[in-house]
Amino acid sequence: MIHEYKNNGYNIVLDVNSGAVHVTDEIVYDLIPLMERNINASDVELAGLLSGRYRVEEVHEAAQEIRQLKEEGSLYTPDTFEQYVQSFTKGKVEHPVVKALCLHIAHDCNLRCRYCFAEEGEYHGRRALMSYEVGCRALDFLIEHSGGRKNLEVDFFGGEPTMNFEVVKQLVAYGRKREKETDKHFRFTLTTNGVLLNDEILDFANKEMHNLVLSIDGRREINDRMRPTASGSGSYDIILPKFKKAAESRNQTNYYVRGTYTHYNTDFAADVLHLHDEGFEQISVEPVVCDPKEDYALKEEDLPVLLEQYDILAREIIKRRKEGRFINFFHFMIDLEGGPCVAKRLSGCGAGCEYLAVTPWGDLYPCHQFVGEEKFLLGNVYDGIVDKDIPKEFGEANVYTKPECKKCFA
């Protein structure tokens, strides 16, 4: 499969199955899809199909380059991954290994974010804080179901996890104790809205948290429209100085500020750049996920503007980096030399089998987006996974089981 596009003055050709990316001149760009459709055409015939735009000699030279790339395995590469990926996903189902938990340490929140899928932290249920006992059992569940995997991920999530910070500290201590007993290693993450962030919490996070996620949407007016406090006032001025201190205290690494863009800020590149101007180097801003009926939901007609925003952002990031102003946008972190293995790229995030969410009372769901939806209740940390069909459905999902995905270059 070949995917071609023009961007920022470049002709870019992606050979999907090999992962090769080619930057070409006009004639090669025009010839590549033509030669894919007309495998046996001579160079003279190809020149004719190009309506005489190029001389036969030019076509011959370009076609030779294309044929060489094909021989090298970086163009027109066949898809040989389907059987391998199906075998990989089957193995995930038959021999499940849980690698990560999202611990809902608090089903309560001190903000009233309009787009929050957790419904003010309650997740379609009651306000609750996870007890130390449930949290310990969750960590033990992860150890017991992690197989031979050494490194395990735990995200303290909410609601707002700092509302139950004493239990967070106790669970980290318990996790460190269990590391020594089991030869496992926990990598903890704390996701926070920053309202309660103080020196004690920050010092603890810098000592124990592998990653710190700081929730802020960008410009003051954008953030405060969607992320008000319980009283209805804005949260921007409360959290910005705290987040700046947090980023600097971690030497601008192992954290990111995480925002959400909606129909009200389709010019979200301005929010990313605003955050950079405020001193943040690690930035993630993502599209809202919500009911299409919501006034802030992204519309089909927003797409051209949104796509252009990513181009604006790419150009500005390149410019700033050349000026010596480092900025890392999470969704541009694509490693062209390495990156995830092909099985992971084609089979998804691991929700429902490798990654699970745990409620304050110990129920298990495929991920935080499903918490509170009873049809996705897997079981609990005491009895384990009771509904085996849900992990099977999630685990077997991959690009090849979805007809539209199978045809898509992405």
Regions found by a protein language model. Give the residues of each.
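Conserved alpha-helical substructure of the radical SAM core
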Residues: 53-54, 60-69, 77-78, 83-203, ...
